[in-house]
């Protein structure tokens, strides 16, 4: 299996990445059970990427049921050391307004 340069974990609002070419869905077993979904692998340009929909391929897993450890181990098994996790969330801080982009 080709080493993945960067992996994306999609949250609410991001269920697929049409920018990925040469798409292959791969089922990966982990020591923590099944990840949220098969993992989409392919390329964006010349970069090897993976995409994992956090809530499942059909958005059928609630936040309390997500197997986070399995998700991370599955991506690690693909050889990635770089993960970008995207989420649509709220905040109690008044200095963050809807539409702000926040890095943690």
Regions found by a protein language model. Give the residues of each.
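Metabolite-binding pocket within alpha/beta catalytic cores that recognizes anionic/polar moieties
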Residues: 1-104
């Amino acid at each position: 299996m080709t080493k993945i340069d960067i992996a994306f974990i999609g949250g609410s609002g991001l269920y697929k990445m049409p920018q990925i070419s040469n798409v292959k869905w791969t089922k990966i077993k982990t020591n923590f059970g099944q990840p949220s979904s098969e993992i989409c692998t392919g390329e964006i340009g010349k970069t090897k990427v993976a995409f994992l929909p956090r809530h499942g391929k059909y958005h059928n897993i609630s936040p309390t049921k997500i197997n986070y450890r399995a998700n991370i181990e599955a991506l690690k098994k693909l050889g990635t050391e770089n993960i970008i996790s995207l989420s649509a969330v709220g905040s109690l801080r008044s200095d963050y307004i809807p539409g702000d982009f926040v890095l943690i």
